[in-house]
């Protein structure tokens, strides 16, 4: 493998591909909008699939639209897989998800140019509906792939704008024939921008992600009584917006009180009738709670529930909650995390251990194969925004760490145990 250790990706080419994909769904404010299974998503998929065909890989699509590009290995072994997603939020940036997919293609392109072979096949995955904006829950494609949701259930999920997941999948031509989970990887490594401020604030360039926060999403509907804003005394009001505002403050204070990695966000706030001189009769908000500790996440959920019950009693409000998504914290495979760290050291680059605060497809893949992630800095910690940015040298560096990590994994003999987090793995001394 001595010659393979000298391989490096072409950073200019990677940036070119990122810019080309960013033009699909581009908006005047500089953001990208490729909501899952829209025409823009289809065009993005078509572009990526055309690049896969150009690289000579086998392209396979499963029944929920997950795309896989597979480069042959010298032996009939499970593939080492990388990848991410290309769907975006409504005002997304150029890098979230797309960077991991395109860096994976650049790894294959680099190996092709060097006429390099690997024992294991190498795969690049493009997962469907990671963002969860148009279809709930998020990470839907990888969730189905990992066996967490049946295909039929996924197909029946309604879009926020009406049609079902299955209807839209067929409409854009990406309802594939392969059964989800048919390809079980030897390992999965996801390269991603941090989407947070830590690396940038510390002047770091790389993160080896060892775990990922658990996520609890709820929709809270608060109903009161609409009435005249000028004639209704404060003591006689049943104000839905007031109840929602109290909940916003409670979630904020709760997260600060629990401390540690606990965070809480009310990200959506809708008021009806939304008029200046009418007491709102209804408010619908979303609550996002996250923690790396499952017991503390459960505590936050219980305390929120108790608060809402008390609020309902005190203010005369009808309050209903609906679960949107719930994922437990994930601990990634520590052997792969160590390989990522060793690879960075081989490239003479500092790397720090990290936790992912955002949900990622890697957390679903960790259910079926050894998995870890690589982070590069997000300038200012900004993501899900047209201001989302990472320095080109960091994008190139992350892709080179991915290249060398994938090469080490693809040259291994032996079988990895899914879910092993203690570093125990039989690889015949090849790693």
Task: Please provide the spans of the model-predicted regions.
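A short beta-alpha structural unit
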Residues: 36, 267-274, 286-293, 318-337, ...
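Midchain, well-structured core segments that form catalytic/ion-binding scaffolds
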Residues: 129-295
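Alpha-helical metal-binding/catalytic segments enriched in His/Glu/Asp
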Residues: 21, 82, 92-131, 216-222, ...
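Acidic, glycine-rich active-site loops and adjacent beta-strand->loop/helix elements
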Residues: 67, 86-88, 122-133, 195, ...
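Acidic/His- and Gly-rich active-site-bordering loop/insert found
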Residues: 8-93
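Zn-dependent metallopeptidase/amidohydrolase metal-coordination segment
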Residues: 14-17, 22-27, 80-84, 350-401, ...
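Flexible, glycine/charged-enriched surface loops at secondary-structure junctions
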Residues: 60-62, 117-119, 176-181, 231, ...
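His/Asp/Glu-rich mid-to-C-terminal helical/loop segments that flank catalytic regions of hydrolases
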Residues: 232-258, 301-306, 351, 376-431
